[in-house]
Amino acid sequence: MFFSAFLTRIYLVIVTIFLVAVIAVWFIPRSDISVHAERRPAFDLTAFFDGKTVAYGIFEDRFGNLRRQFRVEIDAKREGNMLTLDERFLYADGEQDRRIWRIEKNIIEGEAVYTGRAEDITGTATGRIAGNTMSWRYEITLELSGMEVEVRFDDFIYQIDKDMAINRAYVSKWGLEIGSVTLVFLKDGLAAQKLPLDLKSW
């Protein structure tokens, strides 16, 4: 009896440790972008996206399986402290989509803070920049398996040079990571080689 109870306790301890480890991985916080403050080139959201941008991306589930691939053409327009990004998407399965971001820059306690809205965004997106890195967080309604599901995006945009930036976005639901997006933005000379982008057929 005593030995059986002892084994039961050991089993419960092992299960608890396993669950804590799994939860820690799923809920692990993303890095504070302040650690990138000295990285160059310094990212300027408005300057980088001004004009036309092309981008290529993939979506992977949390197991690393490729689920979707897509390309995007982005037209940007500046008006004062407001930046409008008109994004047009084409997915490999032929689906087309469009999202228009309206992003405003404000200075709060000496720090630039970005807020953005789009039709399919719940509430307001918020963003900050440190060095070559921008964090951009928002909740969005996506259609998954024929159902509309609200998920959270934690985006990190890293400017590599004047013509290129890489976006890593972590997608979560109820705090659990369900997938990630990798997106490469191309500007100026690199973008010119791809324009006009075919957004009608893959």
PLM regions and their residue ranges:
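Edge/loop elements at the starts and ends of beta-strands within beta-rich repeat scaffolds
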Residues: L45-G51, I129, I160
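Amphipathic/hydrophobic helical signal segments and adjacent flexible N-terminal regions
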Residues: F2-D50, Y56-N65, L190-W202
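Long, acidic, intrinsically disordered low-complexity segments
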Residues: M1-S4, N106-I108
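Extended interaction regions within the primary functional domain
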Residues: W26-H36, P41-T46, Q69, D86, ...
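A generic hydrophobic-segment detector
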Residues: A5, M134-R137, T141-W174
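Central antiparallel beta-sheet cores of small beta-barrel/beta-sandwich binding domains
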Residues: Y56-L144, F156
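Glycine-rich, aromatic-bearing surface loops/beta-hairpins
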Residues: D155-W202
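Hydrophobic core residues within well-ordered beta-strands of beta-rich domains
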Residues: F49, F70-V72, V151-F153
